[in-house]
């Protein structure tokens, strides 16, 4: 029995335009801590609420090695009253934000591989978190790029991408696909 060789032809990466340094993140967090502690001063003094402690850039770097991170929505994250990304809701008829990120990375990967989207016959999205359950992100990406074949999402927690690669290799080895696009849009 002859097995078709399985090779990785190209990779792509989506990098958001904005980044947040530890100093920026800590300044926002510490502003939130000051507001929280001030608003709950009486309860903190009574011992019914624990005061929040400030953080530092040095602590984040020592604990995680991270000095900065790329983000899609800097304004929401750096607002001490929000401290999370703010995204406009999208209907199921619109491309999800994660699918949009996946499409950008997939286009890069296809360009790097010298492969046309129409030559892809299997699309796997392997994420640990999905923005929404329906429509399947893989189908969104398949449709947006113009890929053929079939598409499905995989969710195997932190191992999703690894399982996606294994699933693609198995599909190629079994002959059910010739060219597989694997996307992790996280």
Describe these PLM feature segments.
Residues 5, 122, 178-182:
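Short glycine-aspartate micro-motif
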Residues 9-12, 126, 155, 180-186:
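Short beta-strand segments
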Residues 64-82, 93, 127-180:
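Conserved catalytic cysteine-centered active-site region
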Residues 118-126:
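Short glycine-rich phosphate-binding loop at a beta-alpha junction
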């Amino acid at each position: 029995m002859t097995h078709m060789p399985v090779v990785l032809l190209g990779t792509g990466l989506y990098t958001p335009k904005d980044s947040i340094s530890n100093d920026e993140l800590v300044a926002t967090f510490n502003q939130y801590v000051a507001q929280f502690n001030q608003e709950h001063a009486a309860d903190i003094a009574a011992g019914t609420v624990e005061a929040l402690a400030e953080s530092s850039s040095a602590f984040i770097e020592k604990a995680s090695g991270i000095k900065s991170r790329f983000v899609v929505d800097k304004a929401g994250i750096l607002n001490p009253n929000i401290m999370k990304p703010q995204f406009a809701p999208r209907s199921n008829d619109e491309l999800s934000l994660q699918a949009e990120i996946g499409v950008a990375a997939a286009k890069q990967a296809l360009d790097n591989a010298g492969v046309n989207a129409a030559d892809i016959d299997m699309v796997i999205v392997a994420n640990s978190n999905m923005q929404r359950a329906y429509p399947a992100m893989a189908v969104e990406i398949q449709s947006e790029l113009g890929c053929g074949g079939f598409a499905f999402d995989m969710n195997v927690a932190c191992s999703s991408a690894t399982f996606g690669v294994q699933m693609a290799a198995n599909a190629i080895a079994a002959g059910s696909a010739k060219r597989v696009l694997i996307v992790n849009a996280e």
